[in-house]
Amino acid sequence: MNTQSAQKQRGVALLVVLILLVMMSALAAKIGQQFCRNLQKTRYQVSQQQLRWAMQGQAAAIKDRLQTDASGESNGLSPEGAWHEPLETQGENYTVVSQIEDAQTCFNVNSLLAIDPAPPADSAAVQPTKPVKEQIVEQLLIDSGISTAAAEEVYQQLVDYLDADSTTAKEALESDAWAGVTPQRLPANQMMRTISEIKRLPGFPVAAYPRASKVLCALPDTESKVDVNTLKPGQAPLLSALSAGTLSEDDAARLIASRPEEGWASVDAFSKTLETNYPQSKAILAQMQAFVAVNSHYFRVESTGNTDDLTLRVVSQIHVDRDSGEVRTWQRRYRMIE
């Protein structure tokens, strides 16, 4: 009996040892996995910080370019000037490439908060039945694939979203008009920070956003001046809408393609080209001049940084003060790709 008892005790002891070994192995594996995750996380954080420092290091060069080419009100912005050349920084384990783009190649929806410019006193053109900005926005929405009726509805919702009051254009409460929206939300009653906010409007079809976001934007300003010197032929619908349809999209594309290599020197030079080549635009010329410019004060810097571990993309929105030339970043968005 003593022998059998001893054997049982040895068996139990062996079983306990095996259980402890299994538990220790599982714990060691878990510790190893956690260590690898922490190590990888640390490498990502170091790489991300390294790329951010490199991007911040490019800020001075970007500032110099914009102050040289974009400051001032009278000079036209050359489409392919030094400001538009890619800026590349290479380090021991990373590469950062930044591209400056003109952010005034779209209609600023926040300008709907300002009163429409008054028509010239000597204008012989027939006065429109709708405000000019309303016509422009609705036409751009229609060009984005939205029906005429839906475009009118979206425009009214957009105005309600931006203005500070709590009533709609039809004197109803905005809270009632937005009551059936899911998920529940109310108009912001302030400027849009990004044009993606337009997707929050109840009547806006999300499928139209890819096209609408190319011609509409949200700048922190109540003015909307489209820089005709940096428009591309694919943005002809925007120029056509600014002309209240006087220029067809094909005409607008040809006008953009015929732009001088260094861009138009002034709005008057642009207007002269427009009137000479498209005489039908004469009646709308004075109205159109209120919405076009040959330079820009808002820019977008698209930076891409690469290391062995990750890719970091940063989009910075920049404003250049037209008087002092001060360059200020008013928005920055990060996106990390592992």
Predicted feature locations:
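Compositionally biased linear targeting/interaction segments
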Residues: N2-E338
